[in-house]
Every structure is written in structure tokens, then in C-alpha cells.
Amino acid sequence: MEMSLRLASSSTSNPICLLNPGKNLNFPIRNHRIPKTSKPFCVRSSMSLSKPPRQTLSSNWDVSSFSIDSVAQSPSRLPSFEELDTTNMLLRQRIVFLGSQVDDMTADLVISQLLLLDAEDSERDITLFINSPGGSITAGMGIYDAMKQCKADVSTVCLGLAASMGAFLLASGSKGKRYCMPNSKVMIHQPLGTAGGKATEMSIRIREMMYHKIKLNKIFSRITGKPESEIESDTDRDNFLNPWEAKEYGLIDAVIDDGKPGLIAPIGDGTPPPKTKVWDLWKVEGTKKDNTNLPSERSMTQNGYAAIE
């Protein structure tokens, strides 16, 4: 590409015209082109910037490799944000943690992690830690199906509380690999839900709820070896079990560190709490101390409250 530049001779302010008076200057100006080289321009540094090979989930990855000494010796090898993420670090140890209510988002995350670990290595166990108050039945059944789909054994461990659908997932682990910590709690009950709207819509919701109840009772019966009638009776109300009761019931196989001194929180001797003054006023019903403003023991029993012995 060329450009033609003409400078008038009458322009005295132009220094080129002053040097060449009475002449018209007409010369081309060409764009400067950088010659191509055979090798790209590069900068070499005395310090090597080569990155170590990327770790995979199936590799033998150890958190202790990120020690202070190793970072001081190799400042170019600092752990990335993804590597320091607790979920990512647990996945490298084949650990999945369910630490919230069971909903659709939590179920999607747990299912994807289970399928990923099973695809990485189907010969090694997957450990599912549970500390959940329960939640959606459909979301929990999705996790249950993913656990059964995995070729690898899924070991379940209860930390804190495994209630409702959390207890169901705890009991659904591989036989012989279901555990509870000694201070944890397990709670089982029948499905909960609400129904509203038109009578037809309510009947549909109630029928669906009864379907889930029968299905869960059948699975619990197969897991624990108890008849469905007993499961239905035991789950009629909230049924809280300590780790040893859950083991005897068939929900788990063992209590971790059972009998280790100092690990188990002290349990009361079973002595009932002292009775209040209200109880004394109830007992003297019909005497001079009778307070007509207090409900009688008979009315409490009729309203659904069991009498206290």
C-alpha cells in the first residue's frame, strides 16, 4: 500500500520547503513491514516455569504433599483454588459428604459424585458420610438408585444425625459397611406431606404419599429383615435410635470406636426429672388446694395426653 505526499513550495512554514525552495516534492511513503522469521520470538528465563503433571482423582494424591517445606523449595508449585476446595479434596480420597437437607440440588451433586468415583475405579469402596435431617423422598430415592447402580461398594457413616431420608440412605449402604459414630443419632418415621386444593387433587396427593410409605416400608423390611407390619408400627411416630439401637434394629452394622474411653458422651442414669408444683396441684384435685384454673388429669388424657405415672 502506497501513499503520495505533496508539499506546496509556497508553504514557508514547512522545513522541507525551506531546504528545497521552488520544488514540488512528490515521494511515496511505504508501510514498514517486519520480515518473517523462521522461529517465533520467545523469552527465556533462568527459572523453569514447567508445570507438574495434573493430578487425577484416581492418582495417589496426598494432602500432606502441600507442606511448608515443599512450598519453600518449589515456589512455582502452589496449590490451586480447585485443589484446596474441601469437596474436591474429599473426592480425591473417594469420600462423598451429605451434610444438608436432601433436596433436588443436593441429590444432583451427590449422584454426580457417586457416578464419577465409580467410573474412576469400580474396585475401590466409596464412603458416604451422612449428617442430614432428611428431606425430599424423590430426591433421596435418586441417591438410593445411584448407590445401587454403582459397581463399587458404597460404605455409609453417620455423623451427628441421620433422620428420615438420611436414615434411609444410611441403611441403604453396602451390607457390612454401614457405620455410626458413637454420639450420632438415627431417626425413622413415616413420610410427611401436605395436601390442598380440590378433593380430586388431594386424593391424588394422598394416594402418592401412601405409595411412598408402602415402598419405603418394603425396602426397610428387606434391609432389616423385619416384617412390614413391624416396620409400619415402628415408623408410625418419630422413632429415635442411638447407634447401638440402630445396630440391633438392623439399620447399621457397627459403631465406630465402640467402647473407646472418652469418645462417648456420658448418658444419664435414667432417673426421671423431679415433678413440678403443677403436678402436685393436679394430685390434690378435690381438696382445699384445688385450683380450678388448671386442667385436670382426666381432661388432659381425653385431649390426647397420656397420664404420667
From Swiss-Prot:
CC terms in the record's Gene Ontology section? chloroplast; chloroplast envelope; chloroplast stroma; chloroplast thylakoid; chloroplastic endopeptidase Clp complex; plastid stroma
Organism from which the protein derives: Arabidopsis thaliana
Q: How is it modified after translation?
A: Ubiquitinated in vitro by CHIP.
Q: What gene is this protein a product of?
A: CLPP3
Q: Which cystines does this chain contain? A: none
Q: Does the keyword Plastid apply?
A: yes
Instruction: List, from the UniProt record, the residues annotated as the active site of this protein.
Output: S164, H189
GO MF, one example:
serine-type endopeptidase activity
Organism lineage reads as:
Eukaryota, Viridiplantae, Streptophyta, Embryophyta, Tracheophyta
Q: Which reaction does it catalyse?
A: Hydrolysis of proteins to small peptides in the presence of ATP and magnesium. alpha-casein is the usual test substrate. In the absence of ATP, only oligopeptides shorter than five residues are hydrolyzed (such as succinyl-Leu-Tyr-|-NHMec, and Leu-Tyr-Leu-|-Tyr-Trp, in which cleavage of the -Tyr-|-Leu- and -Tyr-|-Trp bonds also occurs)
Q: What is the role of this chain?
A: Cleaves peptides in various proteins in a process that requires ATP hydrolysis. Has a chymotrypsin-like activity. Plays a major role in the degradation of misfolded proteins. In the absence of CLPP3, modified ClpPR core(s) could be formed, albeit at strongly reduced levels.
| Phosphothreonine PTM sites in chain numbering | T194
Q: What induces it?
A: Repressed in darkness. Accumulates during leaf senescence. Induced during cold acclimation (at protein level).
User: Mind telling me which InterPro entries this protein's record contains?
Assistant: ClpP, ClpP/crotonase-like_dom_sf, ClpP/TepA, ClpP_His_AS, ClpP_Ser_AS
Give the protein's recorded name: ATP-dependent Clp protease proteolytic subunit 3, chloroplastic
Tissues and organs where the protein is expressed, per its UniProt entry: Mostly expressed in leaves. Also detected in stems, and to a lower extent, in roots (at protein level).
Cite a single GO BP annotation.
Answer: proteolysis
Q: Where is the composition biased (Polar residues)?
A: 292-309
Effect of gene knockout = Delayed embryo development and seedling lethality. Can be rescued by adding sugars to the growth medium.
Q: What span is annotated as transit peptide? A: 1-70
Summarize the subunit comment. Component of the chloroplastic Clp protease core complex which consist of at least 16 proteins: CLPP4 (3 copies), CLPP5 (3 copies), CLPR4 (2 copies), ClpP1 (1 copy), CLPP6 (1 copy), CLPR2 (1 copy), CLPT1 (1 copy), CLPT2 (1 copy) and 3 copies of CLPP3 and/or CLPR1 and/or CLPR3. The core complex is organized in two heptameric rings, one containing CLPP3,4,5,6 in a 1:2:3:1 ratio and the other CLPP1 and CLPR1,2,3,4 in a 3:1:1:1:1 ratio. Interacts with CHIP.
Disordered: annotated segments: 290-309
Q: Which residues does this entry mark as bearing N-acetylvaline?
A: V71
Q: Which family does it belong to?
A: Belongs to the peptidase S14 family.
One Pfam annotation reads CLP_protease
Key words, A-Z = Acetylation, Chloroplast, Hydrolase, Phosphoprotein, Plastid, Protease, Serine protease, Transit peptide, Ubl conjugation
